[in-house]
Amino acid sequence: MADIVILGRGQDFSLLTADDSPAEMGPYLSAGPIHKAARYQLYALLLGCFSEEAEAFEYLHHQLDTDGPYILLIDRLITNKLATFEESEVEQITEHWLACSPMEALDVEADQVLSFVFELVHLCKLRAQTEQLDLFVYHEG
């Protein structure tokens, strides 16, 4: 299963079990073929850091079983930054992101990635409106 980005409350995800559907936890977005290394590259572009440093901005919130799946929390530094983006900025960051090696290696159309980033920004804008919400990634490992 592809990773899923989900908007929700941390305490709700702490109760999630391996038998539960993560899509029922709140508004969500499938990452499709966009894996962790590619997301780290996006975070690096947003923050002006190395992708190795960007790994620190997505961390374990809850482990559903010994070998996963995992609920990862996306740091608010990332979500707050994305929440401020206007349409032209979304297009610009997507263009730069597509030129990075983890994204070049994926079999994904530029329009699909642009749509993903627009939807991600929308979730981040919703998150910014409600202090109790955060953005999580459901990752099977």
Task: Indicate residue ranges for each PLM-predicted region.
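Acidic (Asp/Glu-rich) sequence patches and key acidic residues
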Residues: 1-130, 138-141
